[in-house]
Swiss-Prot record:
Binds 1 pyruvoyl group covalently per subunit. One of its GO terms (cellular component) is cytosol. It holds the Pfam family AdoMet_dc. GO terms for molecular function: adenosylmethionine decarboxylase activity. Its EC number is 4.1.1.50. It comes from Methanococcus maripaludis (strain DSM 14266 / JCM 13030 / NBRC 101832 / S2 / LL). It comes from the Archaea. Keywords: Autocatalytic cleavage, Decarboxylase, Lyase, Polyamine biosynthesis, Pyruvate, S-adenosyl-L-methionine, Schiff base, Spermidine biosynthesis, Zymogen. This is S-adenosylmethionine decarboxylase proenzyme. GO terms for biological process: spermidine biosynthetic process. Heterotetramer of two alpha and two beta chains arranged as a dimer of alpha/beta heterodimers. The gene is speH. Catalyzes the decarboxylation of S-adenosylmethionine to S-adenosylmethioninamine (dcAdoMet), the propylamine donor required for the synthesis of the polyamines spermine and spermidine from the diamine putrescine. Is synthesized initially as an inactive proenzyme. Formation of the active enzyme involves a self-maturation process in which the active site pyruvoyl group is generated from an internal serine residue via an autocatalytic post-translational modification. Two non-identical subunits are generated from the proenzyme in this reaction, and the pyruvate is formed at the N-terminus of the alpha chain, which is derived from the carboxyl end of the proenzyme. It is an enzyme of class 4 (lyase).
Length: 122
């Protein structure tokens, strides 16, 4: 069996609220995470909400990394979806944790596009 992509979902709790509200810092974290997993960056776009919170996405040749933050709750939700054998989405986690400093990180690992003998598995 083969998979077309790997998707990790991160639940980050107890993060530093200042980091969660730092738009330039989040942009830098996304770029560093892309480098860490070996992906190819196309662009990064972030948006700062009022009074707080940041949403961002790094668009990759191999898919995307996204983040949504709630500084008032110390929480961030992230998706790292990659295609291709050379990209390792789990290698983004140390870069993300270094910047956000969560007390707890939950990781869900999903295999996307499972193919069995050259055909899509139903």
């Amino acid at each position: 069996m083969k998979q077309l992509g790997k998707h990790i979902i991160l639940e980050l709790w107890g993060c530093e609220s200042q980091a969660l509200d730092d738009q330039p810092g989040i942009e830098k974290m996304l770029v560093n995470a892309v480098k860490a997993c070996g992906a190819t960056l196309i662009c990064v776009k972030t948006h700062k909400f009022s009074p707080q919170g940041v949403t961002g996405v790094a668009v990759l040749s191999e898919s995307h990394i996204s983040i949504h933050t709630w500084p008032e709750l110390g929480y961030a939700a992230m998706d790292v979806f990659t295609c291709g054998e050379h990209v390792k989405p789990e290698d983004t986690i140390p870069e993300i944790e270094k910047f956000l400093k969560p007390e707890k990180t939950e990781v869900m690992d999903i295999k996307r596009g499972i193919i069995d003998d050259g055909e899509v598995k139903e």
